[in-house]
């Protein structure tokens, strides 16, 4: 299926605005672009309470988090890790998505503002992500926990689920992996398909990896490339969404299949006509609403 019409028009607008590819920017320039895109999504639903938190990191540093509490008694906690190749992205840009998930699921959402590369390279993002999980478990006790994220945030969700299993960490009811980075192989079929070089390109992924984990040996470790973990048995149930026109499509689907083979319950869906980053484009791309509904229904299923 070709790209849907809304996506075609969105990309046309970006082209007319003269937006350069991310890999031709500095990290600071790329982060500024992310902030501009975030302004397009609107304010999101009202929350009963919004709190800013400071989480202590495992290396002695700290990072922020935003806690979005919907009306009513929370049914669970969603710890959400934003995308951005471990280099860009901030919780302000994902506030609308977080509010939408909180409103639709009745869960408290914790947006983790983990530290970014190249200022904080591998393994900082994964370590911060796990610290956010343990903070949520301690600060919001007694509620089932879902870890979720898109792109690099999907990578962090998978990494956190692996570590929680291995270290007998906080129990995770569900892992939501939206077009996740699961491997450092940049030469599979979805990477080399010209039709997938859209919002995220192979060159941009090289740029992200070079900033985050310049050492090739580090990239191949399971806490950077979870597809390379030897054993995926005993992990929490997973929802894996991929986009048809995305360089990350094949590795996300390969991870879903590995999970299945390990006996993990998996719901996997390839979103037809969609490109990378569509999930977070609330109120901009119609495909976002459909994918969010899939995620909400999966979360409802584990919280019943």
Predicted segments — roles?
Residues 285-304:
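Catalytic active-site module of serine/aspartate enzymes centered on a nucleophile-bearing elbow/loop
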Residues 240-242:
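Short beta-strand/loop motif that positions the catalytic acidic residue
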Residues 75-84:
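Short beta-strand element of the alpha/beta-hydrolase
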Residues 90-91, 97, 110-144, 282-288:
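Catalytic nucleophile-loop/oxyanion-hole region of alpha/beta-hydrolase
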Residues 149, 153, 157:
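Gly/Ala-rich beta-loop-alpha elbow adjacent to hydrolase catalytic centers
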């Amino acid at each position: 299926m070709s790209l849907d019409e809304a996506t075609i028009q969105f990309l046309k607008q970006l082209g007319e605005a003269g937006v350069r590819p991310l890999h031709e920017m500095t990290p600071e320039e790329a982060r500024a672009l992310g902030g501009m895109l975030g302004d397009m999504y609107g304010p999101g639903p009202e929350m009963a309470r919004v709190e800013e938190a400071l989480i202590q990191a495992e290396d002695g540093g700290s990072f922020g988090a935003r806690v979005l509490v919907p009306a009513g008694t929370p049914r669970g906690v969603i710890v959400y890790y934003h995308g951005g190749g471990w280099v860009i992205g901030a919780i302000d840009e994902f506030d609308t998505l977080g509010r939408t998930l909180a409103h639709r699921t009745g869960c408290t959402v914790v947006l983790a503002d983990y530290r970014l590369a190249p200022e904080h390279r591998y393994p900082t993002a994964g370590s911060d992500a796990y610290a956010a999980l343990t903070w949520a478990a301690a600060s919001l006790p007694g509620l089932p926990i879902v870890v979720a994220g898109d792109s690099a945030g999907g990578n962090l969700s998978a990494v956190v689920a692996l570590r929680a299993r291995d270290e007998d960490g906080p129990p995770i009811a569900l892992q939501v992996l939206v077009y996740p980075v699961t491997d450092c192989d940049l030469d599979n079929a979805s990477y080399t398909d010209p039709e997938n070089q859209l919002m995220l390109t192979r060159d941009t992924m090289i740029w992200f990896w070079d900033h985050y984990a310049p050492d090739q040996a580090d990239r191949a470790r399971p806490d950077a490339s979870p597809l390379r973990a030897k054993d995926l048995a005993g992990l929490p149930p997973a929802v894996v969404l991929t986009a048809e026109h995305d360089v990350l499509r094949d590795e996300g689907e390969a991870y879903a299949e590995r999970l299945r083979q390990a006996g993990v319950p998996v719901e996997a869906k390839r979103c037809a006509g969609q490109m990378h980053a569509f999930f977070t484009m609330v109120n901009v791309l119609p495909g976002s609403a459909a994918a969010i509904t899939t995620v909400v229904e999966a979360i409802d299923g584990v919280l019943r």
